[in-house]
Each structure stands twice: as C-alpha cells, then as structure tokens.
Amino acid sequence: SNNSSFLKNISKEQSKVLVRIFTDLMNKKALEAGCTNTHFVTPNGLDASDENGIHQTTAYDLSVMMSYCIKNPDFIEITKSSSYSFSNLDGKRYSVTNANAFLSMYDNIISGKTGFTADAGYCYVCAYKDENKTFIVALLACGWPNNKSYKWTDSKVLLDYARNNFEKQVLLDNIKTFNVKVTNGTS
C-alpha cells in the first residue's frame, strides 16, 4: 500500500529528523509530567548524546513517568498484556511478546518496562496496584550480564517491604478554612 511504500522510502537523514521530532515530543511530555532530570536522545532508550547532553533519566523521574502513564487505562491494558498480535496496513501479521516477566512473578503488577544498555546496566520500572495502594518501583544499574534476574529479586524485596510497612493514613479530616485579613498584604 502507499503507507508501507512511504516508510520503505524514508532516507537515513529523514529518519534522523523523525527521531529528533519524536524525542523532542518525549522531552516535552516528560517535563509536563513533572520530570526534571530527564533528557531523551533516542526513542528506544539506547545510549546516545546530542548537543543538549546524554540520554539520561533518574529513578525518581522514571517513577514520575510511570505514575503519569498508569492514569491511562489503555496504557495499563497494553503494558500488562503478555503478548499481542496485529496486522499492518498490507495485512501482514506480527506478534510481539512483552519482556516484562515480572507480570507473572508478582501479583497485582499492572505495568512495567525493562531496559538494558552497556552504560546503564539492567533497569526496570513497574507499577503495583491493589484495592488500597499503588506503588512504583524504579531500579537503575540493577546488575550487568550474568545478573539479569537481580531486577526481579530487588523489585520483589521493595514491593514486599512497601506492602508490609505502608498504610494509607488520613492526616487531616474535616478541614475548615478561614478568611484572614492581612495588613499591607497584596493579592
């Protein structure tokens, strides 16, 4: 079809421009979500740099991104699926498998994203949700080759600790507001 021939005919330079446009949108969305120490250079998370610095984030910013994403029910449905099959516009079938093995290792995991680069090591961010609590785990540099399973073990330890040690507490109930006159104040 015309759509697939368009994609086949994109030059290397055009591809670079499209990646730049996409990562600019990713950086803008990260800022909107509340991330302050993230800079995307590649859409796939691979190590790279540009005139604004290296491709980087923090565990905190990953947790902010995951917290933002899980507000979208479609995002949760997609990311908690173990596999998915679809067709392109020409009717060719594809199947993808979710690399997030933790989905089947720990109850109530609603989303997660794995990652690995030589510089970053194994990284993982996931969201846990039960009837009362939601927890986000973000792990960076959680082992290098031969230690691929560390991210699962560490996620389990952190989630077990959170589930057993944190309860929702109401700090203020029936809050009353008052109008207070401030002399020489400005609004």
Predicted regions and their residues:
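Domain-terminus/edge residues, biased toward the C-terminal soluble/receptor-binding domains
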Residues: 35-36, 53-187
